[in-house]
Amino acid sequence: MSTGGPQKLEAQGGKEGKEWDDGAEHDGVTKIYVAAGGLGIEQIRFDYVKNGQPKEGSFHGVKGRSTISTIEISHPAEYLISMEGWYDSTNIIQGIQFKSNKHTSQYFGYEFFGDGTQFSLQVNDNKIIGFHGFADSHLNSVGAYFAPISSSLTTTPNKVEAQGGNGGETFDDGVFDHVRKVYVGQGESGVAYVKFEYEKDGKRETRDHGKMTLLGTEEFEVDSDDYITSIEVSVDKVFGYNSEIVTALVFKTSKGTTSPPFGMVTEKKFELKDGNGGKLAGFHGKASDVLYALGAYFAPSTTSTTPSTTKKLQARGGNGGASWDDGVFDGVRKILVGQGNDGVAFVTFEYNKGSQAILGDGHGKKTLLGTETFELDYPSEYITSVEGYYDKIFGVEAEVVTSLTFKTNKRTSQPFGMTAGEHFELKEDGYKVVGFHGKAGDLVHQIGVHIVPIFTNYRVAI
């Protein structure tokens, strides 16, 4: 095996049609276009980056009445590591799936059902930089060029210096994929407490610093398709403290959302921001009984793994409890619903991300009635809509969700709860549910969904 240049893996599938070769003189793959029809993959195209400049590829195959689906790869932080698929006796590629170092694509075409030949294009510690194969009216075969993953592609987060005083103990939360929620607690003189909810590899983690007071906390939640771009830090010298302390925080996001000022804004302000337009990925600073200083880590905004096709449907129900958002995944595997005396008291969802099953946080409060489970036959089964009811119940100020029913591409679940009150349906034709959000306290007050287009076609035996 040669290590002096790109490595070429032979095309998998049939050799019918015209041979095509995009070449290997690329830095990476930036976009993939796939059209899947009744007989398999009809057409495919790859866009690349070469010497830092975008390069459009050519279409291979002929698109019929099918629609073209796209995958965007955020070069250079994200790169393609494998392509998997299968072909049958027609020597046409029937289904394909792509994996990057950040996420796994939808399955395009038919899922493998046991009658055909599976293949995988992958080289350890290498990335895909080009494709080749054969195509006629459909994609007959596909192979790939690989090159070592350059260390220069590993983006080092930018650590922005902490602003404020020198008191307290140093903390450093490190770097995460996302900052999902920020909690700020006030004291008599400034910010006394902060808690940050992070996400890494699909799992939520929290870090807190300082000391919470009887004033409690205020929160700022970031939408799953948004990210924080800057933090304004107000500092001041306050009687009783040997150094300056943080008196207020203001957060701004890429979509133009600005939080209210959490605390007392002063004339002396600093802005924590990345000069390259990066997104917030973690915090560091100094704290004890108050927050003395705050700094931040920023990562390239291209590390966002949320597909641009994701939509967030507004949560339905009453305006009670605290907001929660599980984020966006590849799909839903399992749903657990717990009943209370008058409504839905608890929900939790098991998702799929890449090759991992991820159990989300519980929302609400379990009762002695326990939980009921609705399990999906993932990945061939997916949720297409969520129906429910919400109503005002005695002793609770805000309406609560009283019933939930889940519809998939194969069946409808039983109603979990009592079908009474205001009816709602969370649905958009051609989309499937890949995440949930809402509001909950001791009961579930609201529920909403994240959805993505349904790209997968499934072969039906007749």
Curated annotation (Swiss-Prot):
Pfam families hit by this protein: Jacalin
CDD domains hit by this protein: Jacalin
SUPFAM superfamilies: Mannose-binding lectins (SSF51101)
Keywords, sorted A to Z: Lectin, Repeat
Record-linked Gene3D superfamilies: Jacalin-like lectin domain (2.100.10.30)
Tissue specificity comment: Expressed exclusively in flowers, in male and female organs, petals and pedicels. Not detected in pollen grains or sepals.
InterPro entries registered for this protein in UniProt: Jacalin-like_lectin_dom (IPR001229), Jacalin-like_lectin_dom_plant (IPR033734), Jacalin-like_lectin_dom_sf (IPR036404)
Positions of the UniProt region annotated as Disordered: 1-23
PROSITE patterns hit by this protein: JACALIN_LECTIN
Conditions for induction: Up-regulated by methyl jasmonate.
Jacalin-type lectin domain segment(s): 6-148, 157-300, 310-453
UniProt key word Aminoacyl-tRNA synthetase: no
Compositional bias annotation for Basic and acidic residues: 13-23
SS bond partners: none
Molecular-function GO terms, alphabetical: carbohydrate binding
Family, per entry: Belongs to the jacalin lectin family.
Protein's name according to its UniProt entry: Myrosinase-binding protein 1
